[in-house]
Amino acid sequence: MDVDRDEVARRLGEDGFVVLDVRSDGEYRGETTAPCDPRPGRIAGAQHFDLQMLLALTPDEIRTRLGPPEDVELVAYCHSGSRSELATQILASLGYRAANYRGSWHEWSRDDSLPAETG
């Protein structure tokens, strides 16, 4: 399942709605960014869960980190929607309600009215 920018923006901060940034540490902190992105950083309030970590953890370790599947709705994003698609498939296989924000940071970073943070 995919969600769009407007839904992510509207639901930011909503209880049980968790935005997961599955990019690298440097991308998440805003220390590295693709040349095509006008600003570095992440969606404000996003939790970091690097795809490489997700691939390395056991299902129980993932559940410990994210909480019980019935308690959260997850939206994953990356730079362009590819890594987050894989993350979404993994999370859905574990019973999570997981959606992919396909526009990801490539889209979000272009709209200065959308909240972003670095560090």
What are the residue ranges of the model-derived segments?
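Rhodanese-like catalytic fold shared by cysteine-dependent sulfurtransferases
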Residues: 1-18, 22-75, 79-119
